[in-house]
Amino acid sequence: MTQRRAMLILHGKQALNEDVRDAVADKRKQGWELDVRLTWEAGDARRLVGEALAAGHRHIVAGGGDGTLRDIAEALALAETQASLTILPLGTANDFARAAGVPLEVSKALQLMDVAPRAVDLGEVGGKLFLNMATGGFGSQVTANTSEDLKKVLGGAAYLFTGLTRFSELHAAHGELTGPDFHWRGDLLALGIGNGRQAGGGHELCPTALADDGLLDISILPAPQEVVGTLRSLLEGGLGIDNMFIRTRLPWVELKSAQGLDINLDGEPLSGEDLRFEARPGALQVHLPADSPVLSRAPMLNRPD
């Protein structure tokens, strides 16, 4: 059997994960030469990707959460390599993996190493790359003291509003978004710019996004003139806020906000008053299920090893 080589770059907190240890042993029995390296601090993922490529590896496995996945995907894209990526979701949210249909069971996720890779896009902003989504709002995760009423009415945008306990605490940011044949300006409560579909642990801000269409899905949650009253009316009427989103797909979009807007790139913070988001089509080869919901195009022929 021809031996196949890969490097698993594993988040340091997963070093003692017995499921990972067993699955790695199984892959080795199947003929894989699978090296394992651990991340410890910021910058390790990029360094380890560089070491893997220098050692001749053409296949990287990202073992961790959405942040680890973003770091490794960015490093591979910046290296301008045709090395491919398998996703081993070990985080809390695993948003891109879940939306893409990647199994959460370790052994099943590693079975994708034997599936032909597909070309997927990345998003780029401010010199940073992201695989899943850029979100803007009032925080990156919902907290325990966010009231259940607020969670119910905010729906997919709930996690953007950190620590809010009353409708009266909501406030909007003024922003302007411009792209090809698209212009929107006004007050917004939340924003999602997605290559993937969900963020914050399963909240679908861009529910129909495709990772291989060369486009970014834009979801804007505009702020009604009377925020508190409108949200209360929606809640009392049994409706959520998801149907208020303005959505479009663009190859690029420029975001301007005089007071600045805090952006979260799969866990990586970014802020600015003038940001340009672009899709980088086919920037990464990723091993995904053949029926992955985020894929649209027919699979490419297998590349020779």
Curated annotation (Swiss-Prot):
The protein's name in its UniProt record: Probable lipid kinase YegS-like
Free-text comment on the cofactor: Binds 1 Mg(2+) ion per subunit. Ca(2+) may be able to substitute.
What function does this protein fulfil? Answer: Probably phosphorylates lipids; the in vivo substrate is unknown.
GO MF terms held by the record: ATP binding; lipid kinase activity; magnesium ion binding
**SUPFAM superfamilies this protein is in?**
NAD kinase/diacylglycerol kinase-like
Which sites bind ATP? 39, 65-71, 92
InterPro entries associated with the record: ATP-NAD_kinase_N (IPR017438), Diacylglycerol/lipid_kinase (IPR005218), Diacylglycerol_kinase_cat_dom (IPR001206), Lip_kinase_YegS (IPR022433), Lipid_Phosphate_FormReg (IPR050187), NAD/diacylglycerol_kinase_sf (IPR016064), YegS/DAGK_C (IPR045540)
Record: active site = 268
